[in-house]
């Protein structure tokens, strides 16, 4: 995500390195590079020009303190303007209705149905909501089935009427059902099309008018670049939606949609989809995204993800075992499962300042965990609890059973031993008390 743009911007700032002061000439040269980087990232031309004009005005209007290098000042100004470009403040959902109603809109293939499931799961687990998903796509039985399957996976009820061809009435009936059965949130998934057409827009306009939703969200595939921006403009003219959801932001996207949409439609990005898993959804924070674009990482989001997986009782149990030097392969396996829940490894690593650039061309394979899991699952319960008994014969058996090599088994045992020693050191220090404090 944004790897190429980050690299290009870093190269642009190097023009100012070694300069004693900011001048019209070196600012113009730097911003020419910045504008080209933005355009190559598929940012809207007017947005890119307006952005660099603002940065130029602010850069030339400031006196550089002797302690601040011109290149550092430029990074600061660009960071602030990128944050403003993407909305400035984090945009929250406003859900005041009883039940609160969220209407989903967007083209077919944008990830609208999957996002509906992700959002239902997020609001259920984080906000203690009781959601009802509503299938209003009367044209594609597969879409109704997809929502039903998602509902089963996240344990959320799905309302559908297989014999009805009236999406407006289905939505109204669903809200009536929600009131009767105590649901406090209704998420309405509507039909999409491969392209905008009058029938589609009339239909979703009618649904919105009938149900008067608290929030209307426009879901768009970020990989479609400027097409995403143009589609957002047309939907906004008809629906006057409240916010944008960018899906597939983890893919090979140049980032143009994320940097253009806020300015073009004057509506905030509220959420981003960052993977296929049902927990791969993040609230959109403009300042944090600016950090990541400029290669500064995103430690806050990384800590938040860790906190979501943090189990205080499990941590206390583990801490006692580590203190007694009883950390075993069952605990090791449990830690791997927690890390996997946080997201894919490359994305997590990119949130650490300075690491994103270093790993850009490195293939970090999430399947690496699979061989570790296979080795541990090939151990007997006694071997997992007492790794010290793993002699040569046992290691050979484990390698055969897991489809790995003796070398891989030995490597894992060495890593496990190092992990156990490191954890014992951490538990005995103040770091062992950090996560509970963060939780508070």
Where in this protein do the model-derived segments appear?
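Primarily NTPase-proximal linker/entry elements flanking Walker-type ATP/GTP-binding cores
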Residues: 8-136, 143-164, 171-190
């Amino acid at each position: 995500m944004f790897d190429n743009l980050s690299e290009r911007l870093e190269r642009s700032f190097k023009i100012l390195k070694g300069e004693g002061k900011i001048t019209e000439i070196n600012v113009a040269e730097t911003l020419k590079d910045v504008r080209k980087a933005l355009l190559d990232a598929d940012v809207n031309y007017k947005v890119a020009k307006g952005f660099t004009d603002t940065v130029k005005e602010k850069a030339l209007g400031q006196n550089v303190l002797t302690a601040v290098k011109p290149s550092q000042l430029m990074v600061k100004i660009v960071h602030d303007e990128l944050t403003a470009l993407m909305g400035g403040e984090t945009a929250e959902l406003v859900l005041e209705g009883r039940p609160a109603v969220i209407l989903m809109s967007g083209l077919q293939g944008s990830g609208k149905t999957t996002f509906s499931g992700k959002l239902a799961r997020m609001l259920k687990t984080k906000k203690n909501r009781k959601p009802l998903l509503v299938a209003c796509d009367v044209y594609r039985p597969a879409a109704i089935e997809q929502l039903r399957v998602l509902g089963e996976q996240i344990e959320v009820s799905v309302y559908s009427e297989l014999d009805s061809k009236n999406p407006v009435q289905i939505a109204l009936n669903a809200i009536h059902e929600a009131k009767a059965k105590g649901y406090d949130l209704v998420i309405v998934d509507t039909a999409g099309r491969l392209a905008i057409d009058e029938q589609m827009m009339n239909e979703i306009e009618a649904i919105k008018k009938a149900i008067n939703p608290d929030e209307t969200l426009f879901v768009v595939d970020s990989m479609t670049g400027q097409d995403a921006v143009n589609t957002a403009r047309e939907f906004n003219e008809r629906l006057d939606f409240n916010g944008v959801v960018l899906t597939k932001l983890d893919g090979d996207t140049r980032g143009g949609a994320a940097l253009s949409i806020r300015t073009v439609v004057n509506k905030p990005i509220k959420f981003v989809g960052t993977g296929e898993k049902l927990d791969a959804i993040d609230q959109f924070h403009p300042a944090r995204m600016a950090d990541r674009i400029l290669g500064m990482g995103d430690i806050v989001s990384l800590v938040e993800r860790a906190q979501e997986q943090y189990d205080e009782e499990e941590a206390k149990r583990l801490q006692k075992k580590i203190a007694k030097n009883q950390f075993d392969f069952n605990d090791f396996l449990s830690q791997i499962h927690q890390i996997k829940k946080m997201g894919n490894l490359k994305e997590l690593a990119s949130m650490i300042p300075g690491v994103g650039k270093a790993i850009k061309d490195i293939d970090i394979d999430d399947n690496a965990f699979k061989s570790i899991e296979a080795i541990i699952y090939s151990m007997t319960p006694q071997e997992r609890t007492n790794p010290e008994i793993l002699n040569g014969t046992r290691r050979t058996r484990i390698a055969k059973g897991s489809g790995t090599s003796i070398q891989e088994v030995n490597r894992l045992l060495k890593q496990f031993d190092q992990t156990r020693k490191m954890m014992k050191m951490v538990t005995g220090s103040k770091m062992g008390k950090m996560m509970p404090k963060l939780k508070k």
